[in-house]
A protein has these predicted regions:
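AMP-dependent adenylate-forming
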Residues: 15-39, 177-179
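Helix N-cap/beta->alpha junction signal
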Residues: 68-70, 115-117, 175
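Conserved AMP-binding/adenylate-forming core of the ANL superfamily
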Residues: 28-79, 96-101, 152-161
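Flexible, non-catalytic linker and terminal segments flanking ANL/adenylate-forming cores
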Residues: 1-16, 27
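Conserved pre-ATP/AMP-binding loop-to-beta segment of ANL
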Residues: 137-181, 188
Length: 192
């Protein structure tokens, strides 16, 4: 049957929860290039645990830059921000420093989430230094180190009633869900 876009008044995280209902928590949701599969249940759990920690450092409705590789961590971070009413802005690390700086201005972004391992492996030290000026840079490794048993317990409880928790924090279906950048006619990135 054809997809009814007009009837799809949902958020990213609500769509994830619908997929969990449809396919089950144990079903593999995604597998990254390192061959690390993650189930729908673990994706939701991780999103609640990480999202709650990131929500404590950001504002509801805030656009938060993601400078991450296309791996599990990106999906967990994106859905975690979405679960708590933040707007992930996907930064393309191959765009170059000038375009990334322009993207950060256009969005506008005051917070960037990244990974030390990614910055090191992709040799992006100068890029993160340049785009991080005047912005808070949150490293996922630091967030992981700060996770307590309480954080994990609260995430597990949230995962038991995900719709209820999400409704308390979520943006509405008419609010921005994600910011993607495309090169503009003058070559400067435009947020869509």
């Amino acid at each position: 049957e054809p997809f009814d876009a007009e009837g799809a008044r949902t958020t990213l995280f609500s769509a994830l929860l619908a997929a969990v209902s449809r396919h089950g928590k144990a079903r593999i949701a995604l597998e990254d290039p390192e061959r690390q599969p993650i189930s729908f249940g673990r994706l939701v759990l991780g999103a609640f645990v990480l999202g709650r920690k990131l929500a404590a450092q950001t504002q509801k409705g805030e656009k938060v830059g993601l400078l991450l590789p296309n791996m599990q961590g990106m999906a967990v971070t994106l859905f975690g921000l979405s679960a708590y009413g933040r707007v992930p802005a996907l930064l393309n690390f191959t765009a170059g420093t000038k375009n990334l700086k322009a993207a950060c201005e256009v969005a506008p972004l005051s917070t960037i989430v990244t990974s030390r391992r990614f910055i090191d492996q992709a040799k992006l030290d100068e890029v993160i230094e340049a785009i991080g000026q005047g912005r808070r840079v949150i490293y996922l490794e630091d967030v992981r180190k700060q996770l307590t048993s309480r954080d994990k317990l609260l995430g597990a409880l949230a995962a038991l009633a995900p719709g209820f928790v999400h409704r308390r924090h979520a943006a509405g279906p008419d609010e921005p869900a994600v910011v993607l950048f495309t090169s503009g006619t003058e070559g400067k990135p435009k947020g869509v």
